[in-house]
Amino acid sequence: MFKFNEDEENLKCSFCGKDQDQVKKLVAGSGVYICNECIELCSEIVEKELAQTTSEEFTELPTPKEIMDHLNEYVIGQEKAKKSLAVAVYNHYKRIQQLGPNEDEVELQKSNIALIGPTGSGKTLLAQTLAKTLNVPFAIADATSLTEAGYVGDDVENILLRLIQAADFDIDKAEKGIIYVDEIDKIARKSENTSITRDVSGEGVQQALLKILEGTTASVPPQGGRKHPNQELIQIDTTNILFILGGAFDGIDEVIKRRLGEKVIGFASNEADKYDEEALLEQIRPEDLQSYGLIPEFIGRVPIVANLETLDVEALKNILTQPKNALVKQYTKMLELDNVELEFTEEALAAVSEKAIERKTGARGLRSIIEEALIDIMYDVPSSEDVTKVVITDKTINDEVDPELYDSEGNLLNDSKTSA
């Protein structure tokens, strides 16, 4: 039996050696004791280390080339856009590193980014991959769901809430995150003339977004929705949040063409027509975005514009097979878990790519096309003992013919008949 009372007066802190009567509290563990003073000291050490970790979050900031290399692992093509993004993001976080005790009289301003390109060209994927590369919180918002205050719809502060949620409500982390706002072209003013009527989802939303783009301390409802009196709000500084705005900007090539056409008056009036759409987008200027319907103040807060090209068949084929998370690799792995080999012929890959172009969905539509071709196979294969290999041909994609099924001896098990 323990004689606790007899030994109690001799108890000491195992760390500092002080007797129990020299400290306020002595906490017993398994054969050891720690006093309140040592607990406080440990707490201070841990807090300092955590603070140092936070302050050094971007000390290992990758160079533009390293950012580009990481983007290349997941995003095929779009070399100019990737290079522009790599430099812009590097400069943004280098600017954040510069802030603080060593800040001098030169103030480096934030440069938000606009990505202009057709649906399925990789705008969202680029933004997502950037956030993963830098290990920062990331949120996506759709500009079409936003309305100015006082109207039915989402307040712009709800965008910030998504970022805060992505950061697990760590405000310091959220304040260094990335927000991607898609469909930004859909909030363009309907004409260059200021309307006397209310433009609920146009200029008013641009004005609301302008505040968080340029940097402000925003009040965010923790549960989302509209603000209410007496509601507790989360305060977040948007100064160091990087905003990437994406949009297809359908028809902006005509705006650019008109501007270029004005410069060639006196020559052939159709001279501007020699530019194809992609070459025209490389000529984009702030005044073109203003003509399209973005207000000058908004354009001024997004100084970097990167153009994404329309993806052709070869680019889409590469997207299907080359990235680390390529769709063909994903579906191959899925069937591999059922001990079945999956193969796509070159003609099948071309057919998938051509169908995506035909549907005008770009890379975004590739998964649904493959899913359509494989749905029956993924349903039947887990309960089939004979099938060890599945071959997807162009006929599977174009004519809805069943994939070729083979057994372990290489024998064809079906006649590739048209699916019911």
Curated annotation (Swiss-Prot):
Pfam families: AAA_2, ClpB_D2-small, zf-C4_ClpX. This is ATP-dependent Clp protease ATP-binding subunit ClpX. Residues 1-54 form the ClpX-type ZB domain. PANTHER family: ATP-DEPENDENT CLP PROTEASE ATP-BINDING SUBUNIT CLPX-LIKE, MITOCHONDRIAL, ATP-DEPENDENT CLP PROTEASE ATP-BINDING SUBUNIT CLPX-LIKE, MITOCHONDRIAL-RELATED. Component of the ClpX-ClpP complex. Forms a hexameric ring that, in the presence of ATP, binds to fourteen ClpP subunits assembled into a disk-like structure with a central cavity, resembling the structure of eukaryotic proteasomes. It comes from the Bacteria. HAMAP family: ClpX (MF_00175). Belongs to the ClpX chaperone family. Gene3D superfamilies: 1.10.8.60, ClpX chaperone, C4-type zinc finger domain, P-loop containing nucleotide triphosphate hydrolases. ATP binds at residues 118-125. GO terms for molecular function: ATP binding; ATP hydrolysis activity; ATP-dependent protein folding chaperone; protein dimerization activity; unfolded protein binding; zinc ion binding. ATP-dependent specificity component of the Clp protease. It directs the protease to specific substrates. Can perform chaperone functions in the absence of ClpP. Zn(2+) binds at residues 13, 16, 35, 38. One of its GO terms (biological process) is proteolysis involved in protein catabolic process. The keyword Zinc applies. One of its GO terms (cellular component) is HslUV protease complex. Keywords: ATP-binding, Chaperone, Metal-binding, Nucleotide-binding, Zinc.
